[in-house]
């Protein structure tokens, strides 16, 4: 039976922190479903289609190199429900610090109550990417700052173009 993992997030935009999680996740599964949560009340910087392409272009080669299939999808329900729909038994969550751990432990407990067959796996961020958040990347890029050390080159180019006009 293939090991399917589900990695949910907004990925607006994908950062080197997200990519770090993907690098650590792909050896754990045969298929990694990277899923963009779509919520009608939120106004993302990048469209869903742009984020899906970013995920495929940036994370796809990392997965392929590890012998893992990457699938970029969207979902608009609970992440644990979406994980089940994709046949995942592993929920991937990245941790930057203790604050993330406290929050993610609560989510993991609730998810386990709703779907005991989906096990949360916490992947600690590598030291170089711990301070990176998509929110800070958007703010820095929006003010003309250089984000090239925080995001993959493709994403840096897309951010520059997004804020050029």
Swiss-Prot record:
Documented EC number(s): 2.7.7.3
Protein name, UniProt field: Phosphopantetheine adenylyltransferase
Pathway assignment reads: Cofactor biosynthesis; coenzyme A biosynthesis; CoA from (R)-pantothenate: step 4/5
- CDD domains given for it? PPAT
Principal place of residence:
cytoplasm
Subcellular location per UniProt equals:
Cytoplasm
Complex formation: Homohexamer.
Q: What keywords is this UniProt entry annotated with?
A: ATP-binding, Coenzyme A biosynthesis, Cytoplasm, Magnesium, Nucleotide-binding, Nucleotidyltransferase, Transferase
Question: Which cofactors, if any, are listed as required?
Answer: Mg(2+)
Describe its function.
Reversibly transfers an adenylyl group from ATP to 4'-phosphopantetheine, yielding dephospho-CoA (dPCoA) and pyrophosphate.
What Gene Ontology terms describe what this protein does at the molecular function level? ATP binding; pantetheine-phosphate adenylyltransferase activity
A Pfam short name: CTP_transf_like
GO CC annotation, single: cytoplasm
Please give the InterPro entries that the UniProt record associates with this protein. Cyt_trans-like (IPR004821), PPAT (IPR001980), Rossmann-like_a/b/a_fold (IPR014729)
> Which residues does the annotation say bind substrate?
10, 42, 79, 93
The positions annotated as site (Transition state stabilizer) read 18
Underlying gene: coaD
Q: Where ATP is bound, by residue?
A: 10-11, 18, 94-96, 104, 129-135
Q: Which domain of life is it from?
A: Bacteria
Question: Is the Oxidoreductase keyword given for this protein?
Answer: no
What family does the entry list?
Answer: Belongs to the bacterial CoaD family.
Q: Which reaction does it catalyse?
A: (R)-4'-phosphopantetheine + ATP + H(+) = 3'-dephospho-CoA + diphosphate
């Amino acid at each position: 039976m293939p090991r399917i993992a589900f990695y949910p997030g907004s990925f607006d935009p994908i950062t080197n922190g997200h990519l770090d999680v993907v690098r650590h996740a792909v050896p754990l599964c045969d298929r990694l479903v990277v899923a963009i949560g779509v919520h009608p009340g939120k106004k993302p910087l990048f469209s869903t289609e742009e984020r899906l392409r970013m995920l495929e272009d940036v994370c796809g080669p990392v997965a392929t190199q590890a012998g893992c299939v990457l699938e970029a999808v969207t979902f608009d329900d609970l992440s644990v429900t979406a994980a089940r729909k994709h046949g995942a038994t592993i929920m991937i969550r990245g941790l930057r610090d203790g604050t993330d751990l406290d929050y993610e432990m609560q989510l993991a407990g609730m998810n386990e109550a709703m779907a005991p067959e989906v096990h949360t796996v916490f992947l600690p961020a590598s030291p170089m990417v711990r301070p990176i958040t998509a929110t800070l990347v958007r703010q820095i890029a929006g003010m003309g700052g250089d984000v090239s050390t925080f995001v993959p080159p493709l994403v840096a180019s897309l951010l520059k173009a997004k804020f050029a006009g």
